[in-house]
């Protein structure tokens, strides 16, 4: 069965972002595993999940709605990364690096 979302650059880049996020949060304190770590992971996973849901081809309106949700998740992720920086879990250079990938995904969505 054809999976049209796997051909989308936005889906591919957002999948790469998920992998990067999962690696990044491994360094967060263990007491954040059910807090900020979980929130960041869920926001990142939501992006390619919504892109794939929208690409399922039911309607253009539904695809746009799914992309809108993915954009919301990217903005949520950006805020959560900023929080991680402000509480000392991320350095400035790492934040900037990950934010540039978030921005790439936003531009493609």
Indicate residue ranges for each PLM-predicted region.
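Amphipathic alpha-helical assembly/interaction segments
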Residues: 1-109
């Amino acid at each position: 069965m054809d999976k049209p979302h796997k051909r989308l650059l936005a889906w591919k880049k957002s999948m790469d972002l998920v992998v990067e996020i999962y690696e990044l949060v491994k360094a967060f304190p263990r007491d954040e595993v059910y807090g900020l770590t979980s929130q960041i992971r869920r926001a990142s996973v939501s992006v390619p999940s919504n892109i794939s849901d929208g690409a399922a081809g039911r309607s253009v309106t539904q695809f746009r709605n799914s992309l809108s949700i993915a954009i919301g998740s990217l903005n949520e992720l950006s805020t959560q990364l900023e929080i991680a920086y402000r509480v000392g879990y991320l350095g400035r250079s790492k934040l900037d690096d990950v934010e540039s990938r978030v921005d790439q995904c936003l531009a493609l969505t």
